[in-house]
Amino acid sequence: MENSDDIRLIVKIAQLYYEQDMTQAQIARELGIYRTTISRLLKRGRDQGIVTIAINYDYNENLWLEQQVKQKFGLKDVVVVSGNDEDEDTQLAMMGLHGAQLLDRLLEPGDIVGFSWGRAVSALVENLPQAGQSRQLICVPIIGGPSGKLKSRYHVNTLTYSAAAKLKGESHLADFPALLDNPLIRNGIMQSQHFKTISAYWDNLDVALVGIGSPAIRDGANWHAFYGGEESDDLNARQVAGDICSRFFDIHGAMVETNMSEKTLSIEMNKLKQARYSIGIAMSEEKYSGIVGALRGKYINCLVTNSSTAELLLK
């Protein structure tokens, strides 16, 4: 243990630094001590229990879950919201709010930002703050439009346009569907100048915001609204766990070819993986296998989810 003079000095430095908010340089000048000595004595004060730092985890009760999921899957960022006792709409709104804060924090001037479709992505876009000034962002869809009658608020073009308006960015929209009747039609659209313009942005994507689908929810209204009458019986037979932008994968993250693959117009997963940030937003036990597959395949490097889903991911 230090002698009494050393302890008195450590206490004095700690009081100036932590309670009076003086910088280490200011303390060094006031006490006539090298700044490196100030730093060393502050560390010694913490190590010996002279100084203790308390964090009020009531403000983020899910921090442990976030850290564990981040470490387990090697992610860049994780946001876990509470709400296990809340209804689904409330939990989704909370995910949208905190996801919007994450996206806004990660964006850099000049970024190309890609959007998929769906309820979760819509919840995030709705909660984006109105930008005070432009960051010269370019917002683009990374999948075509629905085959069925999807609610406009979940449509990829609606989300892309709305996000660009809030972020004071530039938007480009998709005038092609995600699923075509046959590969010949798809290949023809891929030769169009419009598609080439959109796909060029996919090649240089900086940030992506995606929902995660699962065959477990294919009886839901939004699945039918997006895919229309497209045959999907082969998904279970091929052990599909989930999809991002209608690109299907198994629970290990390996891509799975389906009868839709050659008729799909959306970003390819190798391009999605090249983005600086690929943010997945999803929750629920039904989507668990899809989320796990997306994480294992490294198709996303950031995750926004709820606490019950995060707990499942750690089992």
Give residue spans per PLM region.
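Conserved phosphate- and dinucleotide-binding cores of soluble alpha/beta proteins
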Residues: 2-14, 19-32, 37-43, 49-57, ...
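Glycine/charged-rich beta-loop-alpha catalytic/anionic-binding loops adjacent to active sites
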Residues: 19, 26, 77-84, 137-143
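Glycine-rich beta-strand-to-loop/alpha-helix junction loops that act as flexible
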Residues: 82, 115-120, 307
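Structural beta-sheet core signal
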Residues: 115, 139-141, 173, 280
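Nucleotide donor/acceptor-binding cores
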Residues: 110-111, 135-137, 181, 276
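Short Gly/Thr/Asp-enriched flexible loops that form oxyanion-binding sites at enzyme active sites
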Residues: 120-131, 220-229
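A short, small-residue-rich loop immediately preceding and capping a beta-strand
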Residues: 31-32, 110-117
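HTH-adjacent hinge/linker in prokaryotic transcriptional regulators
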Residues: 43-112, 125-135, 147-155, 167
